[in-house]
From Swiss-Prot:
Alphabetical list of PROSITE patterns matching this protein: KINESIN_MOTOR_1 (PS00411), KINESIN_MOTOR_2 (PS50067)
Organism: Homo sapiens
The protein's name: Kinesin-like protein KIF27
Function of the protein: Plays an essential role in motile ciliogenesis.
Predominant place of localization: cytoplasm
Gene: KIF27
Signal peptide: none
Record-stated family: Belongs to the TRAFAC class myosin-kinesin ATPase superfamily. Kinesin family. KIF27 subfamily.
Length: 1401
């Protein structure tokens, strides 16, 4: 049996929105391209599977669970359970939440496994699958059936079957045929499961849940044997356990009180027991120690999964938040230990089918042996008839006959053993009809063979010998070898199948790697292509930049020369009176400087594309207007016209502006500066604004993409809910249509019956009138008789009696007729009621169809919305890619633009003081904003540092408490070791003294007399015994000191747990210290920068304004900081409220969908019950038709009376069986005590009972009776009688079954409510039967006295449900009723009904 380790997977959930808002750090990370997890700084763990925060449900299922589903179909038991702290994603991973409102991509392990299982079942048509489902909850260490809530917790018990597998007795197992039924049962169980709300989780599981799928496979063996017999089918039984554990909780974090606190205690105790089991199984040093499975019920249920015969996968769910560091570390440690657990999975073949196959093969061999023996007998008879003179041949044949007779006797013994085994198997194991039929045929065949053998032996006088050729022996040997070869071949086939599976897995992995390589190659080609295009564009842009720089230098030279000419004219310069032409001010002003022969310059600076958003244009225009306002304030007016047209219109405007620049000169005020220089300034500003606009575009597109993705998820969820509701509606519509058909059928039957009744009503009315007339006539005659004076008084009394009898009969007849008339009216109204119900059902079906049409319409609309959203998302993704590519190119040009800005600034410094002043103002504003942000960031870091310090203090206090407890245990260990050292010292000194005394005694023995020698030898023996005991003690003490086992195992375990907890807390403290140090460093640097910045602020403010303005500005600065901080906190609070609102909305939506689901389920159940009711009504109407409508109410009454009588009889039989068992136990105990001698009680090795054995025998006798044997059907009793007639040797085990089956006792005793017999002869026969049965019982009890020496007695226990507690008053009444004489008891109703039949036969 091959051992395999438990597979362990770790799944790290992403940070929650609440954790991200509070800036929780990520302390658990996945090492890329490996199956390793790192927690904190340097703690690395390796597992079988590792899933990061971006892993999907499909990935988890395909990697971990799919192989388990394949193993389940192969016949192995499988288990998957999720382990981790509360709120780490266990229920989400397993899939135990509300399934109807979950989209396809977010479904957990259980729904996917259910689909996979039924898909595999559909792929194997040659195998009959029987699927059962159970759902158990462990709540407060009590078992609870989630599929049958009415089942009491006391009726559910954990037991072990004959193979050692853990089973739950009393749990409901539902047969299912499809995945939809399983999903509905799972949904029903999830709705009944205990969940609650804590501070860490809105939907916290308050119990452990185990969802089990049991599959029984029956392989159809279509190959027949050579002689035409069929082998029994092959049975395989396997189970899949899906375990959703409740998370470990800390009261300080969850804030549980009251009932939630009690639940937390039970949850933590169960998880502690599970952790102890994992530690015991995973620690190689503790393999020989006891495994504490019985410490909790969840560990008992997981016994097969941890160290048993199942294939197990443990999924450890971990929170990455730094606030849960210690919990995550402990979970990873337990998961690492679980990797050392090894299971021994086996295929679960049904033992009954294997036994039947073996017996059928043995029967086949015996049949062949009998045929060969019969052939040998015929040959020997032929030889005897021929009278061959060869005496040597006769002697050899006689020897062969003797040998064959010995073999025949052996075969007969085998047949008898097989026969008794089959009879026992038939009584103990429930067989189906096919197997029972086979057994009965085999019984008949054995009986026929025995008869044929007897007749053949009688025919030849019982002296004929058997002969068999040597070929038969060789055939049997060859068949045995063939059987061995078949077993070896089957084992080889299993190995080959395993190898084939491994080869398939390797092929799949190779294919996956090839596909990944292809994908990487394609992505590499695309990246190379993009890189080549980018290089080409960069080269083109570099060339353009060089050309533009050359032309810009030329243009600057021409501008400076023209400016000198204009400024040097003085008063001769003419100032035009009209307004100058305006220059368009757009995003790229570099084009509006005329370049005569460069049309390719548009490739560098192009206008934004047509698909840019309007809001981006609006923002751009507002910023441009703000720039214009600043320029007008400085008396440098530059009016610009904005073009909102398309790209063509913009290009036309650019060409026109270029011609204006060529044809006209710029007209300025006398003290103004040249406007072309200002154009270069605006050009730089617009280039910067372009980059900002591109970033804004990307942010807007990403936000819109997130919104569209959210809408897409909502539409998918609505689609799944609508599809689920449509499926349920179709099921309900179909069921209601079937119910309508049943109602129509019932209505037709009721109409036909009502027609019959209408005829009978008229007849009954006629009979009623006639009866009334007869009644009136009899009353008149009675009055006449009373008025007449008859001489004979006796005659008068006789006539009065006769008339009164007639009157009573007539009244009774009238009452019966009136009742029949009422019943006929009710039956006639039945068809009308059915028509009404059918109309109501048709209306509900129409309403459901209308709902279905609406849902279909909604589905179409949602599909269209989904397609539109997909298109929008693809378009936004394409835009983002293009903008990112464009911004990447522009970022490559930033150094050139910065160089140009530097040149422009150097050129403008001398003459443009006002522009410098504006730039200084902007810089000061930016600087103030940066200072405010620095202060805010510093305060936020301070708050985070304070929170980390508080957490570290809590961890340190916890560590100190653990250290105190550890120091207490270590001191105890030290004191114990010191005590052991002193003990060992005392023992050694005492041993030295004893050795001295022994040496002295030995010297005295040599010199003393005989009497003294005996005394001294006795003293020496005493001293030697004391020495041996002291040596043993010293050896034990030395062993304890050597191994360090000073404390008890519990204290050692507690010390081990404390060391682990301290280690985890030290790691958490180390992690906290590291984060605190980093924060302190950043805070010191920020403090230094802030102090320097504050000094700069004060200096600049002192230079700009007086002291009062400076103080006001400083106060304003603090006020702004406080307001920004309050704004941040309010924003954080608003985000939390939004998240809570979203959670509440999701909860409301889930509850509404669950309510709709439950309504449809209730409607479905109600429809099913109505359908069953209508079928029963049809059966009654059919029965009524067969009886022609007479006595229907009488049959109802008789049935009800019979049911009541049977219930009374059942109660009586239970009571009498208990009394008989008690009496039987007492009588058997007395008989055993009388027959067994006292000397026999002390013998232990001869198979005779000890006193303890007597007690055990009485206990076995207590449970020996089997009431089920009294409830056998007639066919089974015939089989038992035929089987018992075939037996040649008495079976001692059957004696126990014969004891409770004492028909005279039960036939003589009857319940008090039984019918009294009218004949006295019957009572006499009953008395005689009772005396016979009493004598028979005493003889049987004497036989039972010797049963104590029999072996192999199998006690059969009654079910606990058959026992109930009775009151003292009821007990006294029963004892008083038992004290009554047996002859006065009434006969049982069943026996009364049987006696006339027995008399007839």
């Amino acid at each position: 049996m091959e051992e395999i380790p438990v597979k362990v997977a770790v799944r790290i959930r992403p940070l929650l929105c609440k954790e991200a808002l509070h800036n929780h750090q990520v302390c658990v990370r996945v090492i890329p391209n490996s199956q390793q997890v790192i927690i904190g700084r340097d703690r690395v763990f390796t597992f079988d599977f590792v899933f990061g925060k971006n892993s999907t449900q499909d990935e988890v299922y395909n990697t971990c669970i799919k192989p388990l589903v394949l193993s389940l179909i192969e016949g192995y038991n499988a288990t998957v359970f999720a382990y981790g702290q509360t709120g780490s994603g266990k229920t989400y991973t397993i899939g135990g939440g509300h399934i109807a409102s979950v989209v396809e991509g977010q479904k957990g392990i259980i729904p996917r496994a259910i689909q996979e299982i039924f898909q595999s079942i559909s792929e194997h048509p040659s195998i009959d699958f029987n699927v059962k489902v159970s759902y158990i909850e462990v709540y407060k260490e009590d078992l609870r059936d989630l599929l049958e809530l009415e089942t009491s917790m006391k009726d559910l018990h954990i037991r072990e079957d004959e193979k050692g597998n853990t089973v739950i007795v009393g749990a409901k197992e539902c047969h299912v045929e499809s995945a939809g039924e399983v999903m509905s049962l799972l949904e029903m169980g999830n709705a009944a499961r205990h969940t609650g709300t804590t501070q860490m989780n809105e939907h916290s599981s308050r119990s452990h849940a185990i969802f089990t799928i049991s599959i029984c496979q029956v392989h159809k063996n279509m190959e027949a044997a050579e002689d035409g017999s069929w082998y029994s089918p092959r049975h395989i039984v396997s189970k899949f356990h899906f375990v959703d554990l409740a998370g470990s909780e800390r009261v300080t974090k969850t804030g549980n009180t009251g009932e939630r606190f009690k639940e937390s205690i039970q949850i933590n105790s169960g998880l502690l027991a599970l952790g102890n089991v994992i530690s015991a199984l995973g620690d190689p040093r503790r393999k020989s120690s006891h495994i504490p499975y019985r410490d909790a019920k969840i560990t008992r249920l997981l016994k097969d999964s941890l160290g048993g015969s199942a294939k197990t996968v443990m999924i450890t769910c971990v929170s990455p938040s730094s606030s849960n560091f210690d919990e995550s570390l402990n979970s990873l440690k337990y998961a690492n230990r679980a990797r050392n657990i090894r299971n021994k999975p086996t295929v679960n073949f049904s033992p009954e089918s294997d036994r039947i196959d073996e017996m059928e093969f043995e029967i086949k061999l015996l049949r062949e042996a009998l045929q060969s023996q019969q052939a040998g007998v015929s040959q020997t008879t032929q030889i005897n008839r021929e009278g061959s003179p060869d005496t040597n041949r006769i002697h050899s044949l006689e020897e062969q006959v003797a040998q064959l007779q010995g073999e025949c006797l052996g075969y007969q013994c085998c047949v008898e053993e097989a026969f008794t085994f089959l009879v026992d198997l038939k009584d103990t194991v429930r067989l189906n009809e096919k197997q029972q039929h086979k057994l009965q045929e085999w019984f008949n065949m054995i009986q026929e063979v025995r008869k044929a053998v007897l007749t053949s032996f009688r025919g030849i006088g019982g002296t004929a010998s058997l002969e068999e050729g040597p070929q038969h022996v060789t055939v049997l040997q060859l068949k045995r070898e063939l059987k061995k070869c078949q077993c070896v071949l089957a084992a080889d086939e299993v190995v080959f199948n395993q190898k084939e599976l491994e080869v398939k897995e390797l092929k799949n992995q190779v294919q996956m790697m090839v596909q990944e390589n292809k994908g990487h190659a394609v992505s590499l080609k695309e990246a190379q292509k993009v890189n080549r295009l980018q290089n080409e564009k960069i080269i083109e842009q570099q060339l353009l930049v060089d050309q533009l720089s050359e032309e810009l230098t030329k243009l600057n030279l021409s501008v400076t020369s023209s400016a000198k000419e204009n400024c040097g004219d003085g008063p001769d310069a003419r100032i035009p009176e009209r307004r100058p032409y305006t220059v368009p001010f757009d995003t790229h002003l570099g084009h509006y400087i005329y370049i005569p022969s460069r049309q390719d310059s548009r490739k560098v600076h192009t206008s934004p594309p047509m698909y840019s958003l309007d809001r981006i244009f609006a923002g751009f225009r507002t910023r441009s207007q703000m720039l214009l306002g600043h320029i007008e304030e400085q008396d440098k007016v530059l009016h610009c016209q904005f073009s909102d047209n398309s790209d063509d219109e913009e290009s036309e405007g650019q060409e026109k502006s270029g011609t204006r620049c060529r044809s006209r000169s710029w007209i300025q005020k006398p003290d103004s500066v040249c406007s072309l220089v200002e154009l270069s300034d605006t050009q730089d500003e617009t280039q910067k604004s372009d980059l900002e606009n591109e970033d804004l575009k990307i942010d807007c597109l990403q936000e819109s993409q997130e919104l569209n993705l959210q809408k897409l998820k909502n539409s998918e969820r609505i689609l799944t809910e609508a599809k689920q509701k449509m499926r349920e509606l179709t099921i309900n519509i179909k069921m209601k249509e079937d119910l309508i058909k049943e109602l129509i059928k019932t209505g037709n039957d009721a109409k036909s019956v009502s027609k019959q009744y209408s005829l009978k009503v008229t007849k009954l009315e006629h009979d009623a009138e006639q009866a009334k007339v007869e009644l009136i006539e009899t009353q008149k005659q009675l009055q006449e008789l009373e008025n007449k004076d008859l001489s004979d008084v006796a005659m008068k009394v006789k006539l009065q009696k006769e008339f009164r009898k007639k009157m009573d009969a007539a009244k009774l007849r009238v009452q019966v007729l009136q009742k029949k008339q009422q019943d006929s009216k009710k039956l006639a109204s039945l068809s009308i009621q059915n028509e009404k119900r059918a109309n109501e059902l048709e209306q509900s079906v129409d309403h459901m169809k209308y709902q279905k049409i609406q849902l279909q319409r909604k589905l179409r609309e949602e599909n269209e919305k989904r397609k539109q959203l997909d298109a929008v998302i693809k378009r936004d993704q394409q835009k983002i890619k293009e903008i990112q590519l464009k911004t990447g190119q522009e970022e490559g040009l930033k150094p050139k633009a910065e160089d140009l800005d530097a040149c422009n600034l150097k050129r403008r410094k001398g003459s443009f003081g006002s522009i410098d002043h504006l730039q200084k103002l902007d810089e000061q504003k930016k600087w103030l904003d940066e200072e405010v942000e620095k202060v805010l960031n510093q305060r936020q870091e301070l708050e985070e540092l304070e929170a980390d310090l508080k957490k570290r203090e809590a961890i340190v206090s916890k560590k100190e408490a653990l250290l105190q407890e550890k120091s207490h245990l270590e001191n105890k260990k030290l004191r114990s070791s010191q005590a052991l050292n002193t003990d060992s010292l005392k023992i050694s000194t005492r041993l030295n003294l004893l050795e001295q005394e022994l040496s002295e005694k030995n010297v005295q023995l040599q010199t003393s007399t005989a009497e003294e020698k005996t005394k001294i030898s006795e003293q020496v023996e005493v001293l030697q015994k004391e020495k041996d005991q002291l040596q043993k003690r010293r050896h034990n003490v030395d062993e304890k000191l050597k191994n360090g086992r000073v404390l008890s195992p519990e204290e050692e375990h507690v010390l081990f747990q404390l060391e682990e907890g301290i280690e985890a807390l030290e790691a958490a403290i180390e992690y906290r210290n590291e984060s605190i140090q980093n924060r302190q460093k950043s805070l010191r640097a920020s403090f230094h920068n802030l102090s320097r910045g504050e000094a700069n602020v004060l200096e600049k403010l002192a230079c700009l304004s007086p002291v009062e303005i400076r103080t006001i500005l400083f106060r304003y600065f603090n006020k702004v900081v406080n307001l920004r901080e309050a704004e941040r906190k309010q924003q954080l609070y608003n985000e939390e409220m939004k998240m809570k609102v979203l959670e509440r909305d999701n909860m409301v939506r889930e509850l509404e969908s669950a309510l709709d689901h439950l309504k449809l389920q209730c409607d479905r159940r109600l429809t099913l019950q109505q359908k069953e009711h209508e079928q029963k009504m049809q059966l009654l109407l059919h029965h009524f038709k067969e009886q022609d409508g007479e006595g229907i109410m009488e049959t109802f009454k008789t049935y009800e009376d019979k049911i009541q009588q049977l219930e009374k009889d059942l109660y009586f039989y239970k009571k009498t069986s208990r009394d008989h068992k008690k009496k039987l136990k007492e009588l058997v105990g007395e008989a055993i005590r009388r027959q067994l001698a006292p000397s026999e009680y002390q013998e232990a090795g001869d198979g005779v009972l000890k006193p303890e054995g007597g007690g055990m025998l009485s206990e076995e006798l207590k449970w020996a009776s089997r009431p089920e044997s009294m409830k056998l059907s007639g066919r089974e009793r015939e089989m038992d009688s035929s089987a018992s007639s075939l037996r040649t040797q008495p079976n001692p085990q059957k004696l126990w079954e014969d004891i409770p089956e004492l028909p005279p006792i039960h036939s003589s005793l009857a319940p008090p409510s039984g019918h009294m017999l009218g004949n006295e002869n019957k009572t006499e026969t009953d008395d005689n039967q009772f005396t016979k049965s009493h004598s028979r019982l005493s003889s049987q009890i004497q036989v039972v006295g010797n049963v104590g020496r029999l072996h192999g007695v199998t006690p059969v226990k009654l079910c606990r449900k058959e026992l109930r507690q009775i009151s003292a008053l009821e007990l006294s009444l029963r004892r008083s009723s038992l004290g009554v004489g047996i002859g006065s008891m009434a006969a049982d109703s069943i026996e009364v009904s049987r006696k006339p039949r027995d008399l007839k036969t």
